[in-house]
Amino acid sequence: MGGEADSRQPLTAEGVAVAVNVRCSNGTKFSVTTSLDSTVESFKELIAQNSDVPANQQRLIYKGRILKDDQTLLSYGLQADHTVHMVRGFVPSSPSAPAANAGNQTTAPQAVGSNDSSNLGGGESLFPGLGFNPLGGGNAMAGLFGSGLPDLEQAQQQLAQNPNMIREMMNTPAIQNLMNNPEFMRSMIMNNPQMRELVDRNPELGHVLNDPSILRQTLEAARNPELMREMMRNTDRAMSNIESMPEGFNMLRRMYENVQEPLMNATTMSENAGNNTSSNPFAALLGNQGVTTQGSDTSNNISAPNAETGTPNANPLPNPWGATAGQTTAPGRTNAGLGGLGGLGGLGGLGMLGADSPLGATPDASQLSQILQNPAMSQMMQSVLSNPQYMNQLMSLNPQLRSMLDMNPQLREMMQNPDFLRQFSSPEMMQQMMSLQQSLFSQNRNTAGQDPTQTGAATGTANNGGLDLLMNMFGSLGAGGLSGTNQPNVPPEERFATQLQQLQEMGFYDRAENIRALLATNGNVNAAVERLLGSIGQ
């Protein structure tokens, strides 16, 4: 055995510890000291001590091959200072784990028909500038439980009264998965044409988006209100110190011209959208400060300094995380954000699920199939559906669903059964329901396209209330908006340049196959690796 090891690796004797580099899918890299004759399983345990990925969820790839647990590192030709790529794999959760987690919670599960939804809330996005809403406010929950969410003003008050709720929502497996995958967030952010144009005009913002630590710190600040307040205090103190330094005022002026002013201009440069903030990624972040509406009362701004007088501004800077006083919102306003992130409410990572679809658009079953094949998506859905308390809070937000459950106790018991929810959300059941929904969409579109002058057309249109209600309830299947995301007109080679480089470093050299896998997984490197490895085994 020793001779064989010497013949395969002359410079390393059997049992001698060597350093092996491990590169994660989020770009981080670290070294692990191990023996080459050790098994892959023991090597994964060493990696788990240096990362947040458990050993049973690790997928190690070396030269395009996935390492099996019962094999040794030397059997794959691994040598000292070589690099092994690690991605997070999908592991089915045990049925006892969710029950144990539910039993450790101090709050008792509320009834489905209860009107008290303060523990969950439905406020505006924690990341309003990106359209990312893990709390399910606005249209984000339309793809999960239809429309009919509580008023956003009331939800904001609930958030203010219960700051721990934000922390609980950010601790969900869905949000944690996003925090551990900055590349996914960066790709979703860059899918927005306005955001991409802003980055092109301001390369400094591009450097921020290309730094995984900054994205991770931003998510951590949103998860921890105390940390966010501390960061805001430190920023104010730093700006005050910079202003007191020589040339500090000019430095702040340049920072305003290069950073803050482009962000303010981003709220007004929507020429085609007018004052509609739904297409603006920074409108909610800046509180519509750059949007002016005709007939607005300017008496509320009597203390604002005149820019032409040259007098310094003695008023405090506006709080981007606070509500804007006296702000008027258009009746048809929707949440600003990326189309691809519209379904992140509730299930926190459903990608295209819940995205606003054009009127009468027919959902695409192939997109649903691609989403259900995503291992991360399956894991997140299982974690959510296995928690009866979380499902009760979600269902209590929809008045129609709540009233229907009150009238049917048997249905309420079924919706509280985790096994039934898992079977109901299986890929086969979802595809069958999608087929039925497509037929309903076709019938609704044909009915709406009838000439009102024809005999019986008006009567048929007036009697479609039941069909509209049924289609609205189909939103509870998570298929309320499978119209496709706002894909930019950019070649996939440019869109997935970073992901293609990572796949090539892992040993996948077929560029065309890599592009097809990335297109099918919407740029998810982990899912693309799973897809490529599955195609190799076929």
Swiss-Prot record:
GO MF annotation, one: polyubiquitin modification-dependent protein binding
Oligomer and partners: Interacts with 'Lys-48'-linked polyubiquitin chains via its UBA domain. Interacts with RPN10 and RPN13. Interacts with PEX2 and PEX12.
Ranges annotated as spanning the membrane: none
Protein localization: Nucleus; Cytoplasm
Record function comment: Binds and presumably selects ubiquitin-conjugates for destruction. Prefers multiubiquitin chains rather than single ubiquitins, with a binding affinity for 'Lys-48'-linked ubiquitin chains. Acts as a ubiquitin receptor that associates with the 26S proteasomal docking subunit RPN10 for the indirect recognition of ubiquitinated substrates of ubiquitin/26S proteasome-mediated proteolysis (UPP).
Gene3D superfamilies, alphabetized: 1.10.260.100, DNA helicase RuvA subunit, C-terminal domain, Phosphatidylinositol 3-kinase Catalytic Subunit, Chain A, domain 1
Tissue: Ubiquitous with a strong expression level in inflorescence.
Chain residue ranges for the region called Disordered: 95-120, 289-316
SMART domains, A to Z: STI1, UBA, UBQ
UBA domain span: 491-535
Keywords: Cytoplasm, Nucleus, Repeat
Domain STI1: 138-179, 192-231, 357-394, 398-433
GO cellular component, one term: mitochondrion
Lineage: Eukaryota, Viridiplantae, Streptophyta, Embryophyta, Tracheophyta
Protein name as catalogued: Ubiquitin domain-containing protein DSK2a
